[in-house]
């Protein structure tokens, strides 16, 4: 009787826990400074789009950017790392999902600077901007485009 009850309890736990394990989205490590408000807003954007975010406050996110082959010309204020790729700057979650699905041979993707209207930089106006695919040789080309006002 006790074994039968334990088996039912174990089955119930497995049915309860299994959906929770699948609920967590892809994990992205985000390297940012502790005082950057737009970085925190970008982290919130990722979370609201299904990503599990591990935020790390660092003195110089540029060190992480360089480690993953993203040159300063493509830099912004934070760097994410997911699936072996660097995600530099205010990249929309949809572009990250596309990267993970397509798995191009690249160092990562980047939104140089801090375009108004990009995730984490929301405001009354939106600039047009491109998410760049940064190749292993340091070159870059448009990967996704986002319209402005």
Q: What are these regions, as identified by a protein language model?
A:
Residues 35, 42, 57-60, 92-96:
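Stable alpha-helical elements in mature extracytoplasmic
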């Amino acid at each position: 009787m006790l074994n039968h009850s334990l088996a039912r309890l174990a089955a119930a736990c497995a049915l309860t826990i299994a959906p929770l394990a699948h609920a967590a989205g892809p994990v992205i490590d985000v390297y940012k400074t502790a005082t950057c408000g737009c970085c925190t807003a970008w982290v919130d954007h990722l979370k609201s789009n299904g990503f599990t975010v591990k935020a790390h406050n660092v003195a110089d996110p540029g060190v992480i950017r360089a480690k993953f082959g993203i040159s300063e010309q493509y830099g912004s204020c934070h760097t994410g790392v997911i699936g072996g790729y660097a995600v530099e700057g205010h990249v929309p979650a949809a572009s990250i999902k596309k990267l993970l699905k397509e798995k191009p041979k690249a160092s990562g993707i980047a939104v140089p600077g801090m375009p108004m209207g990009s995730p984490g930089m929301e405001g009354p106006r939106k600039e047009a901007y491109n998410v760049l695919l940064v190749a292993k040789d340091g070159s870059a080309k448009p990967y996704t485009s986002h319209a402005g006002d």
